[in-house]
């Protein structure tokens, strides 16, 4: 692949070695060298960025993956963007495969919509274009006042299923909760496979979070001002039904699909349930493998046979701890997106056959 126009500068942030490795793969596909930038922390833990080449009038692309120190990662990105802005870059595009704080995209209790705050900070710093993959909620695109390209990793995961699971025709796609049923349905329809949904105690805690602010109860009667007929009815509390699997998984390979694997307890519980229902092999596939805390150990000790994630987030240490974790490289689609944006070409090819629910 060759970039036909000059004036492209590709920078890698310094959050971790995997970020640099991903940036090198993208640069190699584009036929360019990584830009020279120095990112480091002062003894007082402040982040300092020094752009070591001219970016005046050029299209700058900054690649940043999310490390365990997510807040430092964000500050690195913001300072790099602002440094390029003050150095008179023509455009500044952020390539952030996993958008941090994406789970905090809804109002919960007396909290805040942190995704909206972070999007505003990126735009304020000087970002003119945002490239990411599989946002946790598509509505996050509306938090930005700049163009957003939400690329999809599902073609790479579908290809992995076809090439690495020899008897995938005997598989069934599984949603571990009703909230992930649309994604599972998309996989099932594209692979011409059956669909199963787990409902009950294995549901995500996120989908069941109470949105009450825990204010004191309303006083029913204040003198004669409130009539008994005006009492406001309250929502009944939820009760999860006994765990059930809607769909036949007996004697089949079960492929659980989701967008993020973080705390794996729900995936382990889903795998145990599927084994009890007769599935003889369990795969878990997701775009973003955060794999926090004890995830590698829990996966290794579970009935899950293989966990497949992309390299949107570094997880080399987790792979050493758990051989069941496999990685799919998505640098190809990121490099093609960069090439098209830089050359002013249409991005529609990268979204071909992608529906509203994908």
From Swiss-Prot:
BP-aspect Gene Ontology terms: nucleotide biosynthetic process
Superkingdom of source: Eukaryota
Record key words, sorted: Nucleotide biosynthesis
The keyword Membrane is assigned to this record: no
A GO molecular-function descriptor: magnesium ion binding
UniProt keyword Repeat, yes or no: no
Gene3D superfamilies registered for this protein in UniProt: 3.40.50.2020
Entries under Pfam families matching the protein: Pribosyl_synth (PF14572), Pribosyltran_N (PF13793)
Coiled coil residues, start to end: none
Chain's role: Seems to play a negative regulatory role in 5-phosphoribose 1-diphosphate synthesis.
Family: Belongs to the ribose-phosphate pyrophosphokinase family.
Protein's UniProt name: Phosphoribosyl pyrophosphate synthase-associated protein 2
Gene: prpsap2
């Amino acid at each position: 692949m060759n970039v036909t126009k000059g004036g492209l500068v590709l920078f890698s942030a310094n959050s971790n070695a995997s970020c640099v490795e991903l940036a090198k793969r993208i640069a190699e596909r584009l036929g360019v060298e990584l830009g020279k930038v120095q990112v480091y922390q002062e003894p007082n833990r402040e982040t300092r960025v020094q752009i070591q080449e001219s970016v005046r009038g050029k299209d700058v692309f900054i690649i940043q993956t999310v490390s365990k120190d997510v807040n430092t990662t964000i500050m690195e990105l913001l300072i790099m963007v602002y440094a390029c802005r003050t150095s008179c870059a023509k455009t500044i595009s952020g390539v952030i495969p996993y958008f941090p704080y994406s789970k905090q995209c809804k109002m919960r209790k007396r909290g805040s919509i942190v995704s909206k705050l972070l999007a505003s900070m990126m735009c304020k710093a000087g970002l003119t274009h945002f490239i990411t993959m599989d946002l946790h909620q598509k509505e996050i695109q509306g938090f930005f006042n700049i163009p957003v390209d939400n690329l999809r990793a599902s073609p790479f995961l579908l290809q992995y299923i076809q090439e690495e699971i020899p008897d995938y025709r005997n598989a069934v796609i599984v949603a571990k909760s009703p909230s992930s049923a649309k994604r599972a349905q998309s996989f099932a329809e594209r692979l011409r496979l059956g669909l199963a949904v787990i409902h009950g105690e294995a549901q995500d805690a996120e989908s069941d979070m109470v949105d009450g602010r825990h204010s004191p109860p309303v006083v029913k009667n204040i003198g004669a001002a409130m009539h008994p007929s005006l009492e406001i009815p309250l929502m009944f509390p939820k009760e999860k039904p006994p765990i059930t699997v809607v769909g036949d998984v007996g004697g089949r390979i079960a492929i659980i699909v989701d967008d993020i694997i973080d705390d794996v307890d729900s995936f382990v519980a889903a795998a145990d349930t599927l084994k009890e229902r007769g599935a003889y092999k369990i795969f878990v596939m997701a775009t973003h493998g955060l794999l926090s805390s004890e995830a590698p150990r829990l996966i290794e000790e579970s009935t899950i046979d293989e966990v497949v994630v992309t390299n949107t987030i570094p997880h080399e240490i987790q792979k050493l701890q758990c051989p069941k974790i496999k990685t799919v490289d998505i640098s190809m689609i990121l490099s093609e997106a960069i090439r098209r944006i830089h050359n002013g070409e249409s991005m529609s090819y990268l979204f071909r056959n992608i529906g509203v629910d994908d």
